[in-house]
Every structure is written in structure tokens, then in C-alpha cells.
Amino acid sequence: VTVYCLTRSSVESRKEELQEIIQSVFAMAGAEVEFSGSYPGWKPNLKSHILDVMKTTYQTNYGVEPRVIIIHAGLECGIIGRNYPGMDMISFGPTIKYPHSPDERVNIPTVAKFYEFLLATLKAL
């Protein structure tokens, strides 16, 4: 039996702790564990210039303040940030339900909204 587990976290040390726990549990069952393909952690900069631009653009275009949240998962920003330290970046996107499961769904109207928002942001830059 082979079990694949992609550990992800916004905090690198927490991801490593989780890997140690997984390793310990499988070791107690007499199994071996090998980790690969891991995403590096990424901590968003809440004082980011691009975040300020996008918040203003969203407010201007939609008449409400955007909902800015930090999620616990590792993101592609971790990979980019590892290769380009100090880059001002942000992660945003449409509404997705049940990610990484057979029931994963995207709310189609939010895809169009975020595409329009991306274009408006690029114009604002």
C-alpha cells in the first residue's frame, strides 16, 4: 500500500512539524514514509503595495470592501517567493468549494468577476 500526502502550510515550520507527526504515526504502524513535492510556506505581507492597489480597485469597481483573508495552505506564491525573495505578490481567485476532493467545485460567476478584477488591477498599476 502506498499513501501519498502533500503537506502544505503557510508557515514552513508548521509544515515540518506536520511531516514529523505523519512520519511518527506511520512508523508506529511499521510503515516507511517518504516526502516529496512539497510547497514551501508563504506568509502574505498585509502591508503590501499590490494589496493596497487591489483593495482600492475592488472598492472602486464593486462598491464594497474586499474580504481579505489568509488561508492555512501553501500556495504557488511560496514557490515563487522562494525563487524571488522580496517580490511583492498576492494570491486571489474565484470561490472554490471542497478543494482537492472529488467534490471540488468552482462558482462560475466568480471566475468572470475575478478576471474583470484582474484586468482592472493591471490598469491601475
Regions found by a protein language model. Name each.
Residues F26, Y58-Q59:
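A generic structural signal for well-ordered alpha-helical segments
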Residues E16-F26:
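Short amphipathic alpha-helices in soluble, non-transmembrane regions
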Residues L122-L125:
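Aromatic-rich carbohydrate-recognition surfaces in CAZymes
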Residues E65-A120:
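Zn-dependent metallopeptidase/amidohydrolase metal-coordination segment
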Residues V3-V11, A31-L51, H72, G78:
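A short beta-alpha structural unit
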Residues V1-V3, R14, L18:
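Oxyanion-binding "anion nests"
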Residues A29, N61-Y62:
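Helix C-cap/helix->beta junction micro-motif
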